[in-house]
Amino acid sequence: MSTRSVSSSSYRRMFGGPGTASRPSSTRSYVTTSTRTYSLGSALRPTTSRTLYTSSPGGVYATRSSAVRLRSGVPGVRLLQDSVDFSLADAINTEFKNTRTNEKVELQELNDRFANYIDKVRFLEQQNKILLAELEQLKGQGKSRLGDLYEEEMRELRRQVDQLTNDKARVEVERDNLAEDIMRLREKLQEEMLQREEAESTLQSFRQDVDNASLARLDLERKVESLQEEIAFLKKLHDEEIQELQAQIQEQHVQIDMDVSKPDLTAALRDVRQQYESVAAKNLQEAEEWYKSKFADLSEAANRNNDALRQAKQESNEYRRQVQTLTCEVDALKGTNESLERQMREMEENFSVEAANYQDTIGRLQDEIQNMKEEMARHLREYQDLLNVKMALDIEIATYRKLLEGEESRISLPLPNFSSLNLRETNLDSLPLVDTHSKRTLLIKTVETRDGQVINETSQHHDDLE
């Protein structure tokens, strides 16, 4: 006759032996066996009753029990009180006490491990609280500090962008005004150039008139000289003719005086001389008057042409001076326009560089914000994982508590006193035969989590008959 006692702990299934690290699992099974039932046959033989505890996140239990089948090898045998061997009870009690002692030692070890496990859970809870406090502090400080810095820098960037935009608009307005001034000056320059060309053409025509007048004056001077020479020649010829006539008259007068009493020719000659002199004086006076009138006309035309030429020269000099002044102004405006365009290009380049720097700063701040968000999300995931671990640990603690309460209730049950066992005479033929059937109902509940979120949950029922 032998008694078998098998005891296993869910803590070992969960965490291994004394030197094995704890690894949580999503499905946990707990098996505890103990000697609780006895069957009567030809001799008193203990049988075992197994209780299977299967825990899942919902805490479901399945039991398997062995019924007692009473059989007798010899029909009609009677069990009498005198045929019972009470020494067997002492052996059973001794072995039961040893088993209880072993169970107490194992329960003490389990209690020590459970205390260590609770200390670890408390330490993890403290770490969880510290992480939560750090997370809240990071949320508060990071949001306020980075938000204020980001807003302040964005306001400064917007202010600088607005200032640069205003400067750019002002420079563009100045550039447009300068372009309009340049266009107006160019139009004025074109008009002045046209007027200059007209003045030059007028001056050229005046020069042609002056040349013509000079030629006419020279021609008139030559004519005057020729007329003077002709007058001198005619006068000389007239004088010679007069002398010849006088000589002839004297010769005739002498001859007449000598020959006959001649008429008085002196008066006739005097009259002829007077006539010729009057005609010569008249011709000379007319020639002088014509010459003087022509000379006066030519002098007046020359003076008029000289005045026009002088005025044209003055206008040409004035136009030339205006052209030089406008050319200097155009050159100065071109230099100013080039300097303004260069400044505008430099400002555009500086604005582009500053805008690129601001964009880089904004991108860097956004990356920092994204990193902070990712870090916060990581802390939240760790916190959720810790919460899941805590929930699993709470479930295991509750399971341990139920197991301990079951063990305590089982230990507190009174033991049967075999010395006072009263056996009655029983006819084994009249006892019904009870077959031993074991029914096992197993509920498997599987929960899959990812990043602290339940993504799948399944439940399975299994009914086995043995």
Swiss-Prot record:
The record marks 351 as: Stutter. Keywords: Acetylation, Cell membrane, Coiled coil, Cytoplasm, Cytoskeleton, Glycoprotein, Intermediate filament, Isopeptide bond, Membrane, Nucleus, Phosphoprotein, S-nitrosylation, Ubl conjugation. Residues 154-245 are annotated as: Coil 1B. Residues 269-407 are annotated as: Coil 2. A motif ([IL]-x-C-x-x-[DE] motif) lies at residues 326-329. Residues 1-31 are annotated as: Disordered. GO terms for cellular component: axon; cell leading edge; cytoplasm; cytosol; intermediate filament; nuclear matrix; nucleus; peroxisome. The modification Phosphotyrosine is found at residues 53, 61, 117. GO terms for biological process: astrocyte development; Bergmann glial cell differentiation; cellular response to lipopolysaccharide; cellular response to muramyl dipeptide; cellular response to type II interferon; in utero embryonic development; intermediate filament organization; lens fiber cell development. Residues 246-268 are annotated as: Linker 12. Vimentins are class-III intermediate filaments found in various non-epithelial cells, especially mesenchymal cells. Vimentin is attached to the nucleus, endoplasmic reticulum, and mitochondria, either laterally or terminally. Plays a role in cell directional movement, orientation, cell sheet organization and Golgi complex polarization at the cell migration front. Protects SCRIB from proteasomal degradation and facilitates its localization to intermediate filaments in a cell contact-mediated manner. Involved with LARP6 in the stabilization of type I collagen mRNAs for CO1A1 and CO1A2. Homomer assembled from elementary dimers. Identified in complexes that contain VIM, EZR, AHNAK, BFSP1, BFSP2, ANK2, PLEC, PRX and spectrin. Interacts with BCAS3. Interacts with LGSN. Interacts with SYNM. Interacts (via rod region) with PLEC (via CH 1 domain). Interacts with STK33. Interacts with LARP6. Interacts with RAB8B. Interacts with TOR1A; the interaction associates TOR1A with the cytoskeleton. Interacts with TOR1AIP1. Interacts with TOR1AIP1. Interacts with DIAPH1. Interacts with EPPK1; interaction is dependent of higher-order structure of intermediate filament. The central alpha-helical coiled-coil IF rod domain mediates elementary homodimerization. The [IL]-x-C-x-x-[DE] motif is a proposed target motif for cysteine S-nitrosylation mediated by the iNOS-S100A8/A9 transnitrosylase complex. Belongs to the intermediate filament family. This is Vimentin. The gene is VIM.
